């Protein structure tokens, strides 16, 4: 996804000190941020000009102690054509030399009122989400009791219909048919809909329905962490399915592994209720409550007592 300086300004409500239309459309290519400490001393080895340059209180304080000539020289060396923007935090005063260097080198110069740490975190969070490599997967992503559940299965098995039933039961639709997933970090997977499919569900025999229009804003969500994958498959006599819940299957998306549960589907089975139970049970396991382990302990104790009675 393309992220421009203009989008960043609108998202974080940044003040424009200097920028023209061309600079506002400059693309940001990395979520990494540079705090130019050593660079202010004139040390530019390993300098990364393609990063957003963020000036906080320390950088600003050092800069104001420099002579006007040295300040201008260092800033001219720091501001490169590849640099998307320079941002000053805490609403700090901006020296004339910084404005002059930005104008001459063609760099957007911006300012924010919030603290440097909060600003750095907000920039990274926003850019990480938009610049992460995305992978499209087929399925329905639902928010069930606050847990992101990706429902997959063969075509025609009833994924969208199950999603609709879950919406009617008070849960929220994130994406149907095509789910764009991306890794926010090594262990966290997020999913969102394709823009053209946002809030839409396709139901065979009915057509495309707008979930937000029919069920309200509380029935949809723009994105969600993917914490559990559920695979629906046709029930076949003789096929072995996990009945105790002590199996541990995972599926990998965008380099992140997600636990997966296989649920057999057959006529008369209320799949949406089963998925609700699976989501709640998964959350209970994360909190340390494992019904399978409890059952095994009870069974072991019962066997031990029976052995003692012999």
Swiss-Prot record:
Residues 264-269 are annotated as: Important for the catalytic mechanism of dephosphorylation. Pfam families: Hpr_kinase_C (PF07475), Hpr_kinase_N (PF02603). One of its GO terms (biological process) is regulation of carbohydrate metabolic process. The active site is at 138, 159, 177 (proton acceptor), 243. It catalyses: [HPr protein]-L-serine + ATP = [HPr protein]-O-phospho-L-serine + ADP + H(+); [HPr protein]-O-phospho-L-serine + phosphate + H(+) = [HPr protein]-L-serine + diphosphate. Residues 201-210 are annotated as: Important for the catalytic mechanism of both phosphorylation and dephosphorylation. Mg(2+) binds at residues 160, 202. InterPro entries: HPr(Ser)_kin/Pase, Hpr_kin/Pase_C, Hpr_kin/Pase_Hpr_N, P-loop_NTPase, Ser_kin/Pase_Hpr-like_N_sf. The keyword Hydrolase does not apply. It is an enzyme of class 2 (transferase). One of its GO terms (molecular function) is magnesium ion binding. Its EC number is 2.7.11.-, 2.7.4.-. Gene3D superfamilies: HprK N-terminal domain-like (3.40.1390.20), P-loop containing nucleotide triphosphate hydrolases (3.40.50.300). The Walker A ATP-binding motif also binds Pi and PPi. Both phosphorylation and phosphorolysis are carried out by the same active site and suggest a common mechanism for both reactions. Belongs to the HPrK/P family. Homohexamer. HAMAP family: HPr_kinase (MF_01249). Catalyzes the ATP- as well as the pyrophosphate-dependent phosphorylation of a specific serine residue in HPr, a phosphocarrier protein of the phosphoenolpyruvate-dependent sugar phosphotransferase system (PTS). HprK/P also catalyzes the pyrophosphate-producing, inorganic phosphate-dependent dephosphorylation (phosphorolysis) of seryl-phosphorylated HPr (P-Ser-HPr). This is HPr kinase/phosphorylase. The gene is hprK.
